[in-house]
Amino acid sequence: SASPERFLSFDGRSGDGDIVSSSPIKGTASTAEGFLPKDRAENVMIVDLVRNDLGRVCEFGSVAVPELLAVEAHPGLFHLVSTVTGRLQPGRGWSDAIDATFPPGSVTGAPKIAACGVIDDLETEPRGVYCGAIGWVDADRRVGDLNVAIRTFWIEEDELNFGTGGGITWDSTPEGEWAETELKARNLLRLASGPALA
């Protein structure tokens, strides 16, 4: 996986409780100046969803947004990234944080439960690993980090696969979403089409 998106990190070593963090990506453009108002609106909507998800398991008043709408450069494109953090309630752990936040809000949309129902109704194939989470957890050290499984290849029956897509909002256009999907896929296609490794 070459995912640039953090789904959930967990750090219980701070001495200030168990800190969880999520950095959803919403908004993709070919230049740093190319973001549309819909990209910003979509990012803020998902930040609110993630704040709500974390608020279910974090101490009251601890959920914060230390970074909103940061522009990150990645090979061939730019993303809007925000970060949401919180301190888990006493007695809550890593599994509680995952239960409260999975699947990642950036790939479901909001409201999450209704959006998941629409996805189930409209998508003809299960997503599998795509849009899930990949990472590591060290229970002994009380740390972990999971990404959102975008920009991720998987092999099925001798075929190399990857998924890509875009979020549909009230002011999306089919042409704009298709262009965003192609932009996200461009480097993956280039990598998959390169010389085979022995």
Feature map (PLM): residue ranges:
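Extended alpha-helical targeting/anchoring segments
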Residues: 1-198
